[in-house]
Amino acid sequence: MVKKQSRLTAKWLRKIGVKEVLIPGLLLAGVLGWTGWQKLGPDIYRNKQAFPDSGIVRVITDGDTFELQNGVRVRTVGVNAPGRGEEKAGEAVKRLSDLVKDKKVWLEYDRYQDDKYGRVLAWVWINCEFTPKFLPSDYMRLSFNRSRPGLTENPEGCKKGKLVQEEMMKAGLAKLETYKVRGELKYEGRLR
């Protein structure tokens, strides 16, 4: 029988996999009366409030980051767009806005699902025919730095849809972001 957590603590949040950057905010929310923490764990990545399958994009932060209507900040995994003050940063923001602003997006998770800034990392799909059937987030993982062969086809349910990262790269407004010491991401090979 699983013991029910009676008090919100930093130790418990770490145990269920919450990133350090999120812990102070969650503790403060708990002190102020938020009880949603009781629905967290044992695997934070399965929590659909923190890691939604889809959403409507309301705010474009920069060329590779946006915010959904529920406040979740999403960073497009696998690519890096010019940041504020860099050449083509404005163009990247405009293109991302044209692709996703006020539209429904579907989020496909990979072996890395969040970053140190508290953003969700996801492959972002648009214009899907119906709810896509994604492979599990750990599909690529064979070990820490070894992966299965990457995916090249669109997921079932999104055969006519578009991968936002791919559209940004085609426009010359994002570059492939790889990590030599980590394993390959699902669509990394497709973007090369």
Predicted regions and their residues:
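Small beta-barrel nucleic-acid-binding modules, primarily SNase/OB-fold domains
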Residues: 2-192
